[in-house]
Structures are given as C-alpha cells and as structure tokens.
C-alpha cells in the first residue's frame, strides 16, 4: 500500500471516528437538555399548584431547579458550539484574503480550546473531592432516590445517603466542559479538513434581513397583477 493510500485511509478513519463520537455526543446533549428543561418546567409547575391550591410546597423544588438549570446551561454551551449559536466577531476574517482565513480560524479555535481545557481542569479539580474525601457531603433538601443508594457502597463506605450527594449535581461541571472541549476539537478538525473557514457559520441579522427582502419581493409580485388590472 502506498503512502498516499495510507494517509487517505487514516483520514477516513479519523473522519469516521469523529462522526460516530459526534453523533453520540449529539444524542447526549439533546437528551440532557430536553430532560432537564422538561423536568424543571414540571417541577416548577407542580410547586406552584402545591402552593396555591394546597397551601404547601415541594421543599426541594428550588434547589432542584437551580441544579437542573446549571446542567442545562453547561451542556447547552457545548450544544451551542455545535449549532453555531454563540456570538462571534468575524470582521477580520471577512476582510482577510482566502488563504489567511483558515489560519485566523485555527488561531481562534486554539484560543477557545485553551480556555475550555483550563475550565475542564478547574472543574475536575473542584468536582473530584466531592466523590472522594467529601463523598458524604449532601445537598440541602433533595432526597436521595432509592435506585441510587448503591452509590453509598461505592463512594461512602456503605453509609446510606438521606439526601442526594453533591457529587451528582456537581458532575455538570466536568461533563459540560468535556463536551465543550470535544466540540472545539470537532470544529478544529472541520477547519483543518476544509469543511469550515470560520467558527461562525451564520449571521442572524443578515439571515433575518434576507428573509425580510424575500417577503417584500413576494408581496410586490403579488401586488403587480392587481396594479396592472387597475391600469387597464
């Protein structure tokens, strides 16, 4: 097998690997965002019903909602990179010659990668003690589900949890930053392979303006037969 064929085979293997992992990551992100958004909405609604109809409340509703919102935001940051939802400035890329756009894009994604890796390291260092020497540290109000009591044997020396241990909701930090780092690696690979020349894939204002122009054009075409009929 020639060197060219070997390089081509390695390229397709890398592309296939990124594609499979990317699809799996898509499923995780979409499931977590949908689950926590739905659960947060239902919990808030149930708490309102309890308060106004039964003069009672769900004690752990506020704390649970805060943790679910944190999960949704941290996972949503990764999902936003995938869908190009984040705000970016591409003035330099637009005025740069085509041969330099890839370089500018690689510099931008390298800065984002450095930032996300620092966040990943910091979030891991913050979360890790809560699953080791601080595994006993529980949340204030959220009860521990019976189906998760097996974790007590794994990390809490068999001592049963009454409330949800903090390492479970705090896991949003390393998981969210790991997903974010992977998304930046994915963007970097797309830039290297020529699929993208920038991290920003769309411009919301320009897209809205184009849509408005199209609507005005259609409205003008619809009015033309009526105007011509009146002239006759």
Swiss-Prot record:
Cell location: Cell inner membrane
Function: Part of the tripartite ATP-independent periplasmic (TRAP) transport system DctPQM involved in C4-dicarboxylates uptake.
Coiled coil: none
Quaternary context: The complex comprises the extracytoplasmic solute receptor protein DctP, and the two transmembrane proteins DctQ and DctM.
Matching InterPro entries: DctQ (IPR055348), TRAP_DctQ (IPR007387)
GO MF annotation terms: transmembrane transporter activity
GO cellular component, one term: plasma membrane
Membrane topology per record: Multi-pass membrane protein
Membrane-spanning residues: 30-50, 58-78, 103-123, 167-187
Keyword Lipid biosynthesis among UniProt keywords: no
Pfam families reported in the protein's UniProt record: DctQ
Claim: Transport is one of the keywords in the record: yes
Gene name of the encoded protein: dctQ
GO biological process: C4-dicarboxylate transport
Protein name in the entry: C4-dicarboxylate TRAP transporter small permease protein DctQ
This protein's UniProt keywords: Cell inner membrane, Cell membrane, Membrane, Transmembrane, Transmembrane helix, Transport
Similarity field: Belongs to the TRAP transporter small permease family.
């Amino acid at each position: 097998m020639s060197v060219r064929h070997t390089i081509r085979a390695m390229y397709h293997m890398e592309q296939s690997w990124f594609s499979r992992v990317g699809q799996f990551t898509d499923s995780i992100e979409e499931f977590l965002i949908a689950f926590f958004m739905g659960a947060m909405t239902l919990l808030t609604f149930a708490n309102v019903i309890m308060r106004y109809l039964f003069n009672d409340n769900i004690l752990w509703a506020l704390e649970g909602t805060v943790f679910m919102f944190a999960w949704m935001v941290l996972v949503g940051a990764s999902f936003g990179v995938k869908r190009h939802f984040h705000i970016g400035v591409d003035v330099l890329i637009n005025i740069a010659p085509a041969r330099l756009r890839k370089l500018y894009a690689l510099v931008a994604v390298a800065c984002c990668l450095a930032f996300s890796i620092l966040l990943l390291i910091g979030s891991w260092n913050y979360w890790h003690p809560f699953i080791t020497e601080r595994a006993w540290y529980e949340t204030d109000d959220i009860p521990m589900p019976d189906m998760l009591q097996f974790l007590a044997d794994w990390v809490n020396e068999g001592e049963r949890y009454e409330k949800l241990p903090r390492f479970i909701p705090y896991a949003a930090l390393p998981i969210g930053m790991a997903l974010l780092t992977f998304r930046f690696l994915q963007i970097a690979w797309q830039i290297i392979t020529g699929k993208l020349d920038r991290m920003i894939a769309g411009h919301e204002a320009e897209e809205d303006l184009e849509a408005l122009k199209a609507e005005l054009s259609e409205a003008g075409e619809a009015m033309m037969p009526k105007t011509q009929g009146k002239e006759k």
